[in-house]
């Protein structure tokens, strides 16, 4: 590298380093068990029944990608209408995408030669499942954030009401502050010269 800087030429391309700019992480180069659940790969151990990161009340996504659960005969949206993601609907007009969703729309290199510099496309169907999975997790996180914000606001209002003095106490403090109190046998305010 130092020799290349001295000669003025660029160093040889190293696999794994971006040349033009940052690229999305190639999920296909990971071990398949890190990308897919146990139901997708026949030789892998089964995935746990529910992800341990989210509380059970917020789970709306099935434990496997939607296409896998649909193939196994399970319902696509278990849990009723509350569990549906708040993302764009496939039959309605598509709103403008946020920055995170635009990043999801970018092609994800999944072929082994993806870092060599050539443009690659993900296998058909895989990208859609990953996007759907990401949208469902995003909807869960938004619901959790909304619930936490509502709970925080409720607690803040309760604390305000609990610490607010009664109107009688305010009146008493006002009257006692305006009345001159007898000094008694205490030391005078000003010491004599």
UniProtKB/Swiss-Prot annotation:
Protein name from the UniProt record: Bcl-2-binding component 3, isoforms 1/2
Induction pattern: Up-regulated by TP53. Up-regulated by DNA damage, glucocorticoid treatment and growth factor deprivation. Up-regulated by ER stress in a DDIT3/CHOP-dependent manner.
Domain characteristics, as noted in the entry: The BH3 motif is intrinsically disordered in the absence of a binding partner but folds upon binding. Folds when bound to BCL2L1. Also folds when bound to MCL1.
Role according to the record: Essential mediator of p53/TP53-dependent and p53/TP53-independent apoptosis. Promotes partial unfolding of BCL2L1 and dissociation of BCL2L1 from p53/TP53, releasing the bound p53/TP53 to induce apoptosis. Regulates ER stress-induced neuronal apoptosis.
Chain ranges for the short sequence motif BH3 as given in the UniProt record: 137-151
Subunit structure: Interacts with MCL1 and BCL2A1. Interacts (via BH3 domain) with BCL2. Interacts with BCL2L1/BCL-XL. Interacts (via BH3 domain) with NOL3/ARC (via CARD domain); this interaction prevents BBC3 association with BCL2 and results in CASP8 activation.
GO CC term, one of those recorded: cytosol
Residues modified as Phosphoserine: 10
Signal sequence segment: none
Organism of derivation: Homo sapiens (Human)
Tissue expression summary: Ubiquitously expressed.
Pfam families: PUMA
Chief location of this protein within or outside the cell: mitochondrion
Chain intervals for the UniProt region annotation (Disordered): 1-28, 71-138
Keywords assigned: Apoptosis, Mitochondrion, Phosphoprotein
Effect of residue 133 to A: Impairs p53/TP53-dependent apoptosis
GO biological process: apoptotic signaling pathway; cellular response to hypoxia; cellular response to ionizing radiation; determination of adult lifespan; DNA damage response; execution phase of apoptosis; fibroblast apoptotic process; intrinsic apoptotic signaling pathway
UniProt xrefs under PANTHER family: BCL-2-BINDING COMPONENT 3, BCL-2-BINDING COMPONENT 3, ISOFORMS 3_4
Localization, UniProt: Mitochondrion
Listed Low complexity bias regions: 71-82
Family: Belongs to the Bcl-2 family.
């Amino acid at each position: 590298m130092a020799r290349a800087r001295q000669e003025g030429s660029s160093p040889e391309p190293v696999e794994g380093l971006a040349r033009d700019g940052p690229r999305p992480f190639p999920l296909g180069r990971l071990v398949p068990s890190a990308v897919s659940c146990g139901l997708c790969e026949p030789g892998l151990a089964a995935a746990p029944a529910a992800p341990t990161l989210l509380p059970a009340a917020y789970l709306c996504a099935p434990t496997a990608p939607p296409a896998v659960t649909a193939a196994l005969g399970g319902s696509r949206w278990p849990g009723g209408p509350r569990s549906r993601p708040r993302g764009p609907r496939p039959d309605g007009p598509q709103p403008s995408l946020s920055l995170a969703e635009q990043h999801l729309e970018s092609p994800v290199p999944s072929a082994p030669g993806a870092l060599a510099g050539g443009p690659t496309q993900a296998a058909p169907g895989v990208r859609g499942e990953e996007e759907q999975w990401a949208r469902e997790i995003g909807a869960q996180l938004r619901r959790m954030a909304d619930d936490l914000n509502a709970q925080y606001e409720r607690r803040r209002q309760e604390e305000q009401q609990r610490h607010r003095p009664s109107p009688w106490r305010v009146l008493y403090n006002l009257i006692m502050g305006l009345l001159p109190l007898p000094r008694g046998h205490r030391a005078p305010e000003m010491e004599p010269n």
